[in-house]
UniProtKB/Swiss-Prot annotation:
Superkingdom of the organism of origin: Bacteria
Name recorded for this polypeptide: Translation initiation factor IF-2
Region (G2): 480-484
Keyword Cytoplasm listed: yes
Keyword Nucleotide-binding among UniProt keywords: yes
Gene symbol of the encoding locus: infB
Region (Disordered): 61-284
Keywords per UniProt: Cytoplasm, GTP-binding, Initiation factor, Nucleotide-binding, Protein biosynthesis
Biased composition (Basic and acidic residues): 151-169, 189-206, 247-262
Subcellular localization, as worded in the UniProt entry: Cytoplasm
Protein family (similarity comment): Belongs to the TRAFAC class translation factor GTPase superfamily. Classic translation factor GTPase family. IF-2 subfamily.
Length: 947
């Protein structure tokens, strides 16, 4: 049977996918080949289809026929054998492919060559060309590719012979009208005539197409010339002869095909050999039948020689060069298998290049510079840096950090990865992903300066601002200290100045930092009688980081014995030289109590603002910064904001982090309602969905839908970030968790009146944690204490609910007693932090110290039945007391630690024995005492820990 080529295998060799199957089937129809998804083709059909797809050479072929049963094949072969007797030139492919190629099918428009019987006699003892062969396909079908003039003459001669055979066929048709085989042969003859005519036309049109490689010439016996006319009428004898011929040829070529099965798809260049037996490196294609006489089979292959056409040597050289080029390309893309239709192909090369690119995905090109958000997931970092995700995770693992692909990377991790992979990282603001594009075009107009007042606690910052505003805010603050960030507008010389008052307590460091980030000028208030303190230095660092000019206000100048020069000297040591000392920083003496120096301070601020030429765009959507957020009864969530650009009006939609809404009302620091908020102006706004985090950016948008969408995106991002932080753990943290499995935790829920105060309390409490006890913040929020807060800690031991500037309701108090949960409220942050510090100290174990008391050497041992071993000792140092702890040391190694159960001097029990005296010592539950051992006594001293 003929070896068939599966369509799927054909697609794979072409480098095409199943999605391109439809296109291949359509192209097959163009050359007369009907294919389906699971169809198979002969190598001939596959070769022609391949040439049509790759090179565009369209050769009409017989459509693919379904496999036939052997009986039908034999009948067709017999019919072919009858017709073959009248022809002298036969061309056929490998006999293994006869079964599907030799059968005529009248319904098809194109068929393989089956020549009609012609009673034409040849000269006796002559030489005839039995067949020609090419590199790949039969010569009849590839006739348009012949360029030799001798071949053109052969084709013309063949046309004349077929015309003569048609005349003989007409006579045969009249005498055998009922013979179905004759009808088929007549159809074949007509088709052969039309094919040869087409071939002659194609020969004239094509002159530079691949040549035939040679001719097969066979010497005939004389007897074969005498019976050509009678062979047609004697149909029974040829029938038997054809069957035998078919079987013999099939057996002969089956053996050859077994040896050449692997070489069918790898054609080699034909070599000139004297016999066909030695020509095993390539196949000689034959037609479906051969001219035999009766039962006589011509098998003398020694009379068969090969003649090569040397006129086409130039074309042959070109073919060899093309084959070498194709071979080099195949070697480069590592083609592992070849077949007759995978010899030359741009498509093949393109496909292999694609495969090679897919295989090299692990070796991605690393970018030299990339832009990375401040907080990015591991897989996002790999995508942006064009790195392999597994390599990134492996690198972090080797550095001691276990992460998943969805975990977030902090700034340190990004820098480490950049160094490991030799990348240049440009860190971008995370908020930019969620911001709506701002209107950057517009006329910039002058805006008021934003001034932040900072300094140490109790140095008079709020009192100074109260004097400027003629208000008394300091008296309304609990404990007389500022615990909220405040924003105010002050008019001086028909010019407005926005003041931001920040807390001076150490717990409010982030509030001071936020104030410095939105300010234009920083006023550092220092008490002249106290000098530079810790929070003063911190405030200066915030101002320096924000790159804003600093003005020093020397407060409390009304007090006696103040020394401003000492204060200036302390600031000069920090690098801030006064103007009168040749520096560039203004030091203004003021008194918040008497008001002295206030006008001078305001004028200095306005002069500095004029020098800075502060301007901003008033048109377009507003961009503001949330200074503080809280929940007010009857108003819901409110926020104090300061506008940086654009204009915020009542009714505008906005979003800030996870909060969104529409501005319902706006009130200034005097409590007056306003409609518009321009750059550098501050106001309290309502209409928020929730309390926004302090320091978040508020963006004005077109409508509520955009605001809600942006807030939801930000909420999803923050939620995933929180999950990532809960799953990330380093090796050090993991080992610490194992070592501290007895770690004592205090679960707390923190509720405060404002977002800034809540943030300060959380940070201060977390700083109290140590290796033994820790505060675990289960929940925190702005607003009153609710029953839900109680349920969060109802099952926890030592749980505490902390309230700052809020009071629980009656129902909440009753539920707290039911759940046995402690609620503690405070109005001053000092008291809250100190009480939590004491609570942690109570849970911590005391520090144990040892005090050496005495030492005794064993001189003798006495074993007393039912009592134990008593050691006779001499006290060499200190005092040995009964009941004290002792270590038994042998050769410098402690072998036992226990208490002295009995201490005797001679026969009397004693409480203690001093240095230089002898005594008897017996340990509690230990008798392995030897001469030469040493007793070392000590006592433990317990001391309280401090945080």
């Amino acid at each position: 049977m003929s070896e068939m080529v599966d369509l799927k295998e054909f697609l794979a060799e072409l480098g095409k996918t199943q999605k391109e199957l439809k296109n291949v089937i359509e192209q097959a129809k163009d050359i007369g080949l009907e294919l389906k998804t699971n169809s198979k083709m002969t190598p001939e059909q596959a070769g022609k289809l391949y040439k049509y797809i790759v090179d565009g050479i369209k050769e009409q072929i017989q459509a693919n026929q379904p496999a036939k049963n052997p009986e039908q094949d034999n009948k067709d072969d017999l019919n072919t054998a009858v017709a073959s007797k009248s022809l002298n030139k036969k061309v056929f492919k490998t006999p293994k492919k006869e079964e599907t190629k030799s059968q005529p099918k009248p319904k098809k428009t194109k068929e393989k060559k089956k020549e009609a019987p012609t009673p034409i006699a040849k000269k006796k003892g002559g030489i005839e060309i039995v067949n020609t062969f090419e590199d790949q396909t039969p010569p009849v079908e590839n006739a348009p590719k012949v360029v030799s003039h001798s071949q053109i003459e052969k084709a013309k001669q063949k046309l004349q012979e077929i015309q003569k055979s048609r005349e003989a066929l007409n006579k045969l048709t009249q005498s055998n009208a009922n013979n179905a085989n004759s009808t088929n042969n007549a159809n074949n003859a007509k088709k052969e005539i039309s094919e040869v005519k087409k071939q002659e036309q194609e020969i004239k049109r094509h002159e530079n197409i691949k040549r035939r490689t040679g001719f097969r010439v066979i010497k005939r016996n004389d007897e074969t010339e005498n019976e050509t006319e009678n062979s047609v009428t004697e149909s029974k004898k040829p029938t038997q002869s054809a069957a035998a011929i078919f079987e013999d040829i099939k057996k002969e070529w089956q053996e050859k095909d077994k040896q050449e099965a692997k070489k069918v798809k790898k054609p080699s260049k034909p070599k000139a050999t004297p016999t066909a037996k030695n020509n095993k490196s390539h196949k000689i294609d034959f037609s479906d039948a051969r001219d035999f006489k009766g039962n006589d089979i011509y098998d003398d292959e020694t009379d068969e020689i090969l003649l090569f056409d040397l006129h086409e040597q130039d074309n042959l050289n070109k073919e060899e060069e093309e084959k070498e080029i194709r071979q080099n390309i195949n070697d480069r893309v590592r083609v592992q298998r070849k077949n007759p239709w995978m010899n030359e192909s741009g498509i093949k090369r393109q496909s292999k290049k694609k495969r090679a690119f897919r295989n090299d995905n692990s070796q991605k090109v690393i970018q030299s510079a990339i832009a990375i958000p401040e907080e990015v997931r591991v897989y996002e970092f790999a995508q942006k840096a064009n790195l392999n995700l597994a390599d990134v995770i492996k690198t972090l693992f080797n550095l001691g950090l276990m992460v998943t692909k969805n975990d977030f990377l902090d700034k340190d991790s990004i820098e480490i990865l950049a160094e490991e992979f030799h990348l240049e990282i440009s860190v971008q603001n995370t908020l930019e992903e969620f911001e709506v594009e701002e209107v950057l075009e517009g006329v910039k107009k002058e805006r008021p300066p934003v001034v932040t007042i900072m300094g140490h606690v109790d140095h008079g910052k709020t009192s100074l601002l109260d004097k400027i505003r003629d208000k008394r805010v300091a008296h309304t603050e609990a404990g007389g200290i500022t615990q909220h960030i405040g924003a105010y507008m002050v008019e001086k010389n028909n010019k407005w100045v926005s003041f931001i008052d920040t807390p001076g307590h150490e717990a409010f460091s982030q509030m001071r930092n936020r104030g410095a980030q939105v300010t234009d000028i920083a006023v550092i208030v220092i008490a002249a009688d106290d000098g530079v303190k810790q929070q003063t230095i911190e405030a200066l660092e915030h101002a320096k980081a924000a790159n804003v000019p600093v003005i020093f206000a020397m407060n409390k100048m009304d007090k006696p014995n103040v020394n401003p020069d000492k204060l200036k000297a302390e600031c000069a040591e920090l690098g801030y030289n006064p103007v009168d000392w040749g520096g560039e920083h203004e030091f203004i003496p003021v008194s918040a109590k008497t008001g002295d120096g206030i006008d001078n301070l305001l004028e200095t601020i306005l002069i500095q603002a004029d020098i800075m030429e502060l301007k901003a765009i008033e048109e377009g959507s507003a961009r503001a910064v949330v200074l503080e957020g809280s929940v007010e009864k009857g108003r819901g969530a409110v926020a104090t904001v300061i506008v940086q650009s654009g204009t915020l009006s009542v009714g505008d939609s906005f979003f800030a982090e996870t909060a969104f809404g529409k501005v319902r009302t706006m009130t200034d620091d005097q409590g007056k309602s306003i409609q518009n908020l321009k750059p550098s102006m501050v106001a309290l706004i309502t209409g928020l969905s929730e309390v926004p985090p302090a320091g978040s950016v508020l963006i004005g948008v077109e409508n509520d839908s955009i605001a809600r969408l942006q807030a939801q995106k930000r909420a999803t991002y923050l939620h995933q970030k929180a999950l990532s932080k809960s799953t990330k753990v380093s090796f050090d943290e993991l080992s610490e968790m194992v070592a501290n499995k007895e770690l004592k935790n205090i679960p707390v829920v923190i509720k405060a009146d404002t977002q800034g105060s809540l943030e300060a309390i959380k940070n201060s409490l977390l700083e109290l944690n140590n290796e033994e006890v820790a505060i675990q913040v289960i929940h925190s929020g702005v607003g009153g204490i609710t029953e839900n807060d109680l349920s969060l800690v109802s099952n926890s031991e030592h749980a505490v609910i902390l309230g700052f500037n809020i009071r629980p309701t009656g129902n909440v108090k009753n539920k707290a007693k039911e759940y046995n949960v402690s609620i503690k409220t405070y109005t001053v942050i000092y008291a809250l932090i100190e009480e939590m510090r004491s609570l942690l100290l109570g849970l911590m174990s005391p520090i144990i110290e040892e005090e050496h008391t005495g030492q005794a050497e064993v001189r003798e041992t006495f074993n007393i039945p039912k009592v134990g071993t008593i050691a006779g000792c001499v006290v060499s140092d200190g005092v040995i007391a009964r009941g004290i702890k002792a270590r038994l040391i042998r050769d410098g190694v402690v072998i036992h630690t226990g208490e002295i159960l009995s201490l005797k001097r001679f026969k009397d029990d004693v409480k203690e024995v001093s240095k230089g005296y002898e005594c008897g010592i017996m340990l509690d539950n230990y008798n392995e005492i030897k001469v030469g051992d040493v007793f070392e006594t000590y006592k433990e001293i317990h001391k309280k820990r401090t945080l």
